[in-house]
A protein has these predicted regions:
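Short, aromatic/basic amphipathic alpha-helical patches
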Residues: 160-161, 182-184
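Replication-associated primase and helicase/ATPase modules
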Residues: 1-9, 13-19, 121-124, 131-138, ...
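Acidic beta-strand-to-loop metal/phosphate-binding motif
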Residues: 96, 168-177
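TOPRIM metal-binding catalytic domain and adjacent DNA-binding surface shared by DnaG-type primases
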Residues: 1-47
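Acidic, metal-coordinating catalytic cores used for nucleic-acid/nucleotide bond scission
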Residues: 150-154, 174-183
């Protein structure tokens, strides 16, 4: 049975770890925290990355140690891999990663080039490669979809495709090691 790790009463260690040690952009991090997708566990002060179904019910919790001496990574007992940590956007783009940190790092590094303005024609796209959200005039990183498999599984990918019929373009952003390349 899936149970969420109890939350700590503050997120000091999580903010220090993600902002200072991992270099996650504060606006990107705050967007996920605001949606209650990231929190700090009470017992071990791990960062917890939550995955929800389309009705907003949590079904997956990936945990990552935050202390400088910790290499702990794992999923909470009963986590359903189809609903691992992900962000649903409205564009036709999905970026799939192995780990939540990889996903947040990518968004932090590229959030400006993931934006597109139909008026200026600027952004990380070429003429024949425009995202669906440009019909609304402007895209930001929030308009795209992102998922972290919390492994090299394809289960969250197929769940995202099932839940988001607008997705037409998938970028697999797995590590360049043997497991990542075999899965890709």
């Amino acid at each position: 049975k899936f149970e969420l790790p109890p939350a700590n009463d503050n997120m000091r260690r999580v903010f220090a770890y993600l902002l200072n040690r991992r270099g996650i952009d504060k606006d990107v991090l705050y967007a996920f925290v605001h949606k209650k997708m990231i929190y700090e566990s009470a017992q071990y002060h791990n960062v917890v990355f939550l995955g929800f179904d389309k009705d907003g019910i949590p079904h997956h919790a990936n945990k990552r140690g935050t202390s400088s001496s910790s290499t702990y990574k794992g999923n909470a007992v009963g986590s359903v891999p189809e609903y691992s940590f992900h962000w649903n956007g409205k564009s036709d783009r999905l970026y799939l990663f192995e780990a939540p940190i990889d996903m947040l790092s990518f968004i932090s590094l590229y959030h400006k080039s993931l934006a597109f303005s139909a008026e200026s024609g600027k952004g990380g796209y070429t003429a024949g490669n425009l995202p669906d959200c440009t019909k609304f005039g402007r895209c930001t990183w929030r308009d795209h979809s992102y998922a972290a498999a919390c492994s090299v599984s394809d289960k969250v990918l197929f769940q995202c495709l099932h839940d988001n019929s607008n997705i037409r373009n998938v970028s697999i952003c797995f590590d360049s090691d043997e497991p990542g390349q075999l899965a890709a």
